[in-house]
Amino acid sequence: MSMPVATYGCTACDLSRWDAGTWGYRYYLFGDIKVRMLVATGWCHTCVDLGVIEVLPDADSELAYQRKLETFQAELSEVLAAEPPRKRWWPFQARKSVKQENLEYEVESAAKALAEYQLARKALSSRVSRARCLRCGSEDCLRLPPHQVGYYDMEPLPVPIGFEHPGCGGQLTIHCDDLRLNMRLTDKAYDLEGLLLEGATPE
């Protein structure tokens, strides 16, 4: 199946990189458990290029996951409270509303995401190294600032993301011009310090 790809560019040079490097499933081995690795596009000062950077879990992000779950739980409680009480003599189960089904799904998904994030924090609690570039393994890298990707924009113009291109001075931009890629995605295993395990395919 093909997927839309976004392109990073620069306002002052011909830099052009896709975001497809973040695709695929990467995980840490925590004993016999596979713990999902979070990644994002970032800048590696060692590679002097854009690349895939680890995103290490932290307390603030865990709190955000928790609040998201609590929000969905509160909305679901309101929906359930608004339903008329079931008649004792009625033998059939009342059919759930679409809103209730959607909220139950959101609660389940948010609870799963929170549990996975908490497991990642536990697995990496004794980690010594900082987030790494997954191409070269360097810790001298940083994640790009938060930005949106308009995969389905009617007019896909390059949009600055608020990051100066190191060594160039231009502003990095992102846009999606309907280009789609059909790639075979592979799983990649890493140790708890973010190093690719032997036998896995390098970035």
Where in the sequence are the language-model features?
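Basic nucleic-acid-binding interfaces
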Residues: A123
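Flexible coil/linker segments and helix-coil junctions enriched in charged and small residues
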Residues: E70-A113, C133
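His-enriched metal-coordination microenvironments in redox/metal-binding proteins
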Residues: M1-T7, E203
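Generic signal for short, ordered secondary-structure residues
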Residues: R26, K112-A115
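Short recognition patches in nucleic-acid-associated and regulatory proteins
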Residues: A6-A59, L63, R67-E75, E101, ...
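Long, compositionally biased interface segments
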Residues: L181, D187-E203
